Amino acid sequence: MKTLGRQMLCYLLLCFAVTTYAEETISIDTDNTSLIYKVDKDKKLRQVYFGSFLDAKEAEATQVTKADAYPTFGTSYVNEAALRAVHGDGNTSTELYFEGVEQNKLSDDITQTIITLKDGCFPFTVKLCFKSYAQNDVIEQWSEISHTEKKPVTLYNYASSHLFFNEPSYYLTQFCGEWAMEMNMVETQLSRGVKNLESKLGVRSNQHSHPCFYLSLDGKAQEKAGRVVGGTLAWPGSYRLSFEVDHRENLHIISGINPYASQYILNPKEVFRTPALLYSYSSKGTGDISRRFHRWAKKYGIYRGDKTRTTLLNNWEATYFDFNEEVLSGIIKDAADMGFELFLLDDGWFANKYPRDNDKAGLGDWNYNKKKLPHGLGYLVNESKKKGIKFGIWLEPEMVNPKSELYEKHPDWVIGQPNRPLDLSR
């Protein structure tokens, strides 16, 4: 009887241990926000909660869901995948299982969490990495992908993050525009299907749209009330923010580098790190989200963000290409009298053989124009010093006009496709 009792006790302890492991809870917290993951009985990592702060007891009480933390291609998952890879042997499927988690406090404000996931068949690893900024209520998330397969792995999709929501409605605010009409705010109610905010323009990724959004979970977004998620991708190149409402009215947000024409050959032992998505949740409307990002940017995102910025006067709208030393000296004097701290000389100051009198010539010839500035740039620098303000100058070194001395001497320096006419757009 004692033996049977011991066996029963061991069995119960084993069941308890398995249950505890299966429901391991990982909380990523700020002062007012919690993002919670759990490991289910199959060792799959699930997102179970993202919202207002939950203490440890409340976090443990959350229920396991079917929401994949980082969904992959080639499994039973049929929505947009965060990861799609072709392994060294040609296998197109990846299935990730929970391996472990590390949490370290980097400072009073920052906690770093690294969750390791591994494929069940290949030596292929994905690390979901987070920095939670407690006082600013911002979470920074990125992914690190590596492997030790015998041959390279080709990555086709490699998202920075995947966020899951189950709400009655979703209102998305995006920011888009064009030259001279930037950052227009447009709100749309999401319906079943996929809405992509994206750019394929490479280094000009912000020209028509911007990698940031608001998501309202309580009807149309409000400035001072309502549950709102705000996010921005810290990446200057081609990007995609994908918002997919599935057949159960769940919303999946996948953020990262645009996979369009962006496959990456990942060699063994190499680590591919994605850009980070910065995001925040608030129950107090878009204004609260905006101020959180302002505070975060001033402290962590901008060089000398805690310092007062220099006030400057730029001559572009006042003169365009039509100016000379006398005109610019007058603007410098007026700028100083009005309390500006810096004068910035804009386009039109350079090129002689093909003067920069319009946007059709001169780019690439970075010598001052002797007709407009007979005494050189040093004269304007000294004029600024006399008035007690700094001097700055505009350059566009990555561009060239065909009508320029630089292009005449080095046409081979221009980026283009062989046997194709040049694309002369800016």
Where do the protein language model's features map onto the residues?
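Short Pro-Gly-centered flexible turn/kink motifs
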Residues: 92-98, 264-283
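Bacterial Sec-dependent N-terminal signal peptides
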Residues: 1-23
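Polysaccharide-binding surfaces and accessory modules of carbohydrate-active proteins
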Residues: 23-36, 45-244, 260
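Short coil/turn motifs at secondary-structure junctions
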Residues: 148, 281-282, 398-400
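Aromatic-lined carbohydrate-binding/catalytic grooves of carbohydrate-active enzymes
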Residues: 304-426
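Short loop/turn motifs at secondary-structure junctions
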Residues: 139, 154, 273, 338-339, ...
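Terminal connector regions
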Residues: 279-310, 317
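Short acidic, Pro/Gly- and aromatic-enriched capping/linker segments at domain boundaries
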Residues: 21-26, 250-267
